[in-house]
Amino acid sequence: RNAELKDSVALTKFIYWLKNNYDKMKITELSASEKLTQLRSEQEGYVRDSFEPLHAFGAHAAMMHYSPTPESDVELKGGQMLLSDTGGGYLEGSTDITRTTILGSISDEMKKYYTAVYKSMQHLSAANFLYGNHGWSLDVLARQPIWDLNKDFQCGTGHGFGYLGSIHEPPTGFRWYIVPSKNEHHQFEEGMMVTDEPGIYEEGEFG
């Protein structure tokens, strides 16, 4: 919990900085990544980023697990969204947090899909369920608001994660179909940590 609180402070400062400076100075995917790492490092007990930060702007955000390079790096501008899939490693624990930051005014279509993804995340995170449930039996709670729009995303909704170790850690996760090669189908036990990361990805446009 302390790690999540510290990471939330860093992330809130980052979003505030982003929204107040994207139209005043040149900010790119890579420089945004450096800024968030700097803000995390200012938190007591920070050790390192949990994994390579993934900041994807505009059409890049529709490419699952896109990671910016000096060759692909683009400047952030208004009228689009920045997808940030990042995490921090602290002495108290690790985080894996995905956030979408709106810059300026966006289209009605973007608003509709952004809202659907928000509903999806909330449906799953607020769910009450009985002992003995698995991720594959609960995944539909996240997907339903997205399925209602005849959309889907081609990955699991969430995965287990460890403490200053592998950020993708078995034995559980959220996926409505079973992938035999993935050890993610164990029933939930008290104390397990699992991410909640639904999404909509419109190729060539946004995500």
What does each of the following model-derived ranges do?
Residues R1-G207:
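Active-site neighborhoods and metal-handling regions in enzymes and metal-associated proteins
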